[in-house]
Amino acid sequence: MRIISWDVGVIYLAYCVLEYVLSKNKEVIINIIDWNIINLMENNRLVINCCGMKKGNTICDKKASYCLRTPDKKLFGYCKTHLTQYNINWSIQDTEKMFTKISKPDNTCTFLKKTGDFCGKKATYKYKNNKSTNYYCNVHYKSELKNRTKEFSPQPIKNTIVKKYPTAQLQYNLIKKLDKLSKHFAMLGIERVVIENQPSQKNPKMKSIASTLFDYFLIRGFCDKIHNIDIKLVRYMCPSNKLKVNKDNTLEVFKANKDSKKKYKLTKALGIQYTKQLLNNEQEQLDYLSLFEKKDDLCDAYLQGRYYLEFIMDKTDKNYPIIKCQENKFNKPNNDDLQNESGDDSETESSLSWENIKIEISDDQADYYAKKYNKSVMNKSNKLMMNKSMMNKSESNKKSNRKSNKRSNKNIITL
């Protein structure tokens, strides 16, 4: 049997496909079939390397934190160390050369005001770009020169702020990523999906990602069965279980550290350590793990899936049944009933009524609902007895009302 375990994050999601094999000696063997990381925001940040030169006349080639965009739309990256070298590719003097002074002011200033009107004064400077040519007066020349100088200078490459990033966009990116991987998952023969549960109040954005992941496999894998994938179970798992795979006494270590930040770092460090210990005899997987910067996410997905296979599978999954839709069975009419007065067979429209639907409730369930809503459970005989007693009470009430009316009429005095 094969399962897929998911470690949930806002930007990075890690998955691990594990295979559960029971040998002839009844020894449990767990193999890693595939594991990887999904980045939900990889296309939003500019990735460029530093083009600055070192002392040995070699290119720095580090990850750039600043970017220079020239008027011809060329990009140059710089790190903090080599930021001062940007003047080699473009300088302030190059920006000033784009403005030329006009000797004969035949044109008017084309600066657009906030009101939507042009300045209209006599132009003294001409700005020429690759696409357009503009004219400016003395006042607006200074402001435009300042704006162009800022535009053609190195700008910091900012990371996308996760808190300001729309949750709906993250969910959309996740669905698109999963659609691309759905055929791959179907070929691996995944049967069960285990997702790390997230607290809804501490981080609602992460909870939304986990819910989207759960709904995707429930809809695509169980209902639609896209690419003939056969998902039989989708469930959440407590995040604290992944560190219980190793038999070391880690609870005492967590109790000693009351600081939440230290606990978080310790959890990540222990996850990587436990994974390396469990994969001690699998050098290929360890080499593959070393290629990733965020090893903790992959390790968490692996430990969670391993804990499920060794301690939870077939023991507590009875509480997570898969609901199968069954069609209602109605009595089919006989051929004699389908014949009309002329004796010919004719198709008749069949209508569904509440009489055809039967709902069966056990005695225990009936007692439970009776206690919950303070109602007594009665069988058919009790109902009939109740109806007869109610009829007798109503008849006796009518007779008593008639007698009281006669008595009241006798006491009336007519004038």
Swiss-Prot record:
It comes from the Viruses. Residues 399-409 have a biased composition (Basic residues). Residues 338-348 have a biased composition (Acidic residues). Residues 329-351, 388-415 are annotated as: Disordered. SUPFAM superfamilies: Ribonuclease H-like (SSF53098). InterPro entries: RNaseH-like_sf, RNaseH_sf. One of its GO terms (molecular function) is nucleic acid binding. This is Uncharacterized protein L451.
